[in-house]
Design a protein with these regions (language model features):
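Helix-loop module immediately N-terminal to the HCX5R catalytic loop
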Residues: 43-67
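Flexible, polar/low-complexity N-terminal or interdomain linker segments that lie immediately upstream
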Residues: 1-38
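Acidic phosphotransfer microenvironment of two-component signaling modules
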Residues: 34, 51-53, 98
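Residues at the C-termini of beta-strands that transition into short coil/loop
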Residues: 7, 31, 48-50, 95
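Short loop/helix-cap segments at secondary-structure boundaries that form the rim of catalytic
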Residues: 36-42, 101
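Catalytic cysteine-centered active loop of the rhodanese-like fold, especially the PTP/DSP P-loop
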Residues: 58-100
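Conserved beta-strand scaffold positions in the cores of enzyme catalytic domains, especially
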Residues: 27, 44-46, 91-93
Length: 103
């Protein structure tokens, strides 16, 4: 996966299906707390991008499948870049909640 693939639009609904089929996967919402409280995808964990160094306190293994979303996909792309800098090898930007369809 190349650098620009991190920001390439994906279908969040398809990615969520993949996440549910992936053992040990974590759904990570990197929006601010107030955005998360207003609306979020069930079973997601909120770590705002602005407080992202907290990820190290979550004790995820470096190869944990992390499916990352935000509002539109931009912050989640930045979060995936930061995760890679921190050594996480299995993080994926799945886009924005604005395209999420509740099923």
């Amino acid at each position: 996966m190349g650098l620009f693939d991190i920001f390439r639009p994906t279908d969040i609904n398809e990615e969520l299906k993949t996440m549910k089929e992936t053992p040990g996967a974590v759904l990570l919402d990197v929006r601010e707390v107030d955005e998360y409280e207003e609306e979020h995808i069930p079973d997601s964990v909120n770590i705002p991008l602005s407080e992202f160094d907290q990820i190290e306190n979550m004790h995820y293994e470096k190869d944990t499948p992390l499916f990352v979303y935000c509002h539109s996909g931009r912050r989640s792309g930045a979060a995936v870049l930061r995760l890679r800098e921190l050594g996480y090898t299995n993080a994926k930007n799945i886009g924005g909640i604005i395209h999420y369809k509740k099923v």
